[in-house]
Amino acid sequence: MNYCFLVFLVYLVFAVNGEDIWKVNKKCTSGGKNQDRKLDQIIQKGQQVKIQNICKLIRDKPHTNQEKEKCMKFCKKVCKGYRGACDGNICYCSRPSNLGPDWKVSKECKDPNNKDSRPTEIVPYRQQLAIPNICKLKNSETNEDSKCKKHCKEKCRGGNDAGCDGNFCYCRPKNK
């Protein structure tokens, strides 16, 4: 009960500040039972980056302090010196607020007719900008795909590459 109240207070503080937040699912198990304890933690958007964590903590017995320490050290290393935390699957790295997180960009406008075909691409946080996209890809038969890309190219002010997923334009800045 106290934990839920604390999470609510943290959420309220961020909501009042008007900043985007991510709800991070912490899936480390507890006790000796194989059950996921889904503890939610609020982390500011722009203060974290998701990095695939090869150090897994999820298993059928309690984690030793040594294992947890090893995981945290691993995450600190992949976070390149920034403070890192792990949930057994992903390292969460604290970064300066002027650097955004990596985004897994869904390239849905690549083949909007095929629901199973959703290629994804990791766009580095230093090479991206998201702009709300007024062009929605609801009707792919009327050449919406090329219209969307053209719209995004204009919005991205002629950057080297502009992609869209129907909700956002993803812009890479020009090479210098």
Curated annotation (Swiss-Prot):
Signal peptide start and end residues: 1-18
Main localization, broad class: secreted
GO CC list: extracellular region
Location relative to the cell: Secreted
Alphabetical UniProt keywords: Allergen, Secreted, Signal
Name recorded for this polypeptide: Salivary antigen 1
